[in-house]
């Protein structure tokens, strides 16, 4: 059979097989076009689950008369014009296929008016007929698209549609997901002329919480942990299901630059953070990640449900650290009086409730940050050290004035209060072992501690008598980590499997090194194998999670190949590598105050005296 170009009608119907899967796919494409057009209100009318009628009405910028026919053509778009535009996409649409594909399998009417036009115009296209008829019409500024008799000319596709109720449920579920991230938009949804959903714009915190409860349920909203973290070009905001809420939920929404996607990296990061509290089920979350569009490729899936991150491991660990921080700040789990005196539940003097005793002197953003130094040194990199809270409050998409806070100060839901005593006791035991490994040796009877103010996220300002000095945070962090590693190393460190094992070229000598130092590596929580001349790094202790493993592990093997390191040397090496991990300033100060006097004095010996008396004399 000879090779020939496909007719435009057939090409559009083939493309429709990828773009238009069901009525919900049509709604998704058309609503996203409305949002790209700057609409602040979108009305969605559905008849018979979308198989009979889908009408989308918006108040966006509209389409000019001369562009109406072109808008229904394949690969016609106003959103990208150059390759550079394609590599930095912030709009929902960019391929120019949706309208052409939809019009090829339905009877489509597009009515639109721009602010510059004195009258509206209407374009009509039907199925395989590629001719577009443009006629005058009456319409306010914006656009209305009617899709009638979906799949009328493709009976095989129409037979695969489910019941009207099922198809409408898919539309309703998709609208919920977009209504969360676009809390500034007024959405309405009607089915068979009956108003089903109305999401009013959320311009205040209370309205935002109301929309969250409307979409995710009151139980989720009442107990959810709010999260807002920023590091370099990454900003993560949203909500996490509280560990106190044991109700299994399907609220797993993740957005990248406002686009709803599915990504296993996110599920793994959230689940790993919760697993450190002993919570094995998949927790609910609504997370919105904003980053440089050059760092993510959205043009990898026909329906744009997936993206490809240029630094997927970096994104995973950023989300992991942000969720860990949210759980650290989580209020202590409320226990009944009977359970508080249960023999199996120890008093919970953990980081979570000790945080209530900390008085923060400096209210600047730097209270929530730790900057561990230059990014040039691998062992000193603070990969997420400058994570802080954006100061501007702008609904779900914006920042928050506190790093992590409960959404509501209300009583736990009935589902939470109905937990069995055994389950609550187990939670209490889990909370007794704080999420952050470095807090495990904090004294049970910790006194009230006032954290000194931070300077540039790198020093604490210490005022004692008439002396003013700067205490380097990095030296304190190193001392705390050494103490933590020393405490745990004797019994062996816990291994954490990598989401994606790291593979590097292996030296011939490493086989013997792994055999000779096998016990040492196991004690350090490191699992390595060699296959096909490749060293595969499978598991590492928490202290190495943020390291450049492809560099650090070979250096370790070279070191232990030449000598048998002492325990103190291993402690120092692991502590040094762990400096790249994020640690909240308040938690670190608590840990520092719990160190023995000798270790504290060693840290204080590194402080820098500020000659403030001389400055006063000079002035």
From Swiss-Prot:
Domain of life the protein comes from: Bacteria
Cross-referenced Pfam families: DNA_mis_repair (PF01119), HATPase_c_3 (PF13589), MutL_C (PF08676)
Record keywords: DNA damage, DNA repair
Protein's UniProt keywords contain Cell inner membrane: no
Any one of the GO CC terms: mismatch repair complex
KW NADP (keyword) present: no
Gene3D superfamilies attached to this UniProt entry: 3.30.230.10, Histidine kinase-like ATPase, C-terminal domain, MutL, C-terminal domain, regulatory subdomain
An example molecular function term from Gene Ontology annotations: ATP-dependent DNA damage sensor activity
InterPro entries membership: DNA_mismatch_repair_CS (IPR014762), DNA_mismatch_repair_MutL (IPR020667), DNA_mismatch_S5_2-like (IPR013507), HATPase_C_sf (IPR036890), MutL/Mlh/PMS (IPR002099), MutL/Mlh/Pms-like (IPR038973), MutL_C (IPR014790), MutL_C_regsub (IPR042121)
Single Gene Ontology BP annotation: mismatch repair
Family: Belongs to the DNA mismatch repair MutL/HexB family.
Functional description taken from the UniProt entry: This protein is involved in the repair of mismatches in DNA. It is required for dam-dependent methyl-directed DNA mismatch repair. May act as a 'molecular matchmaker', a protein that promotes the formation of a stable complex between two or more DNA-binding proteins in an ATP-dependent manner without itself being part of a final effector complex.
Name assigned to this protein: DNA mismatch repair protein MutL
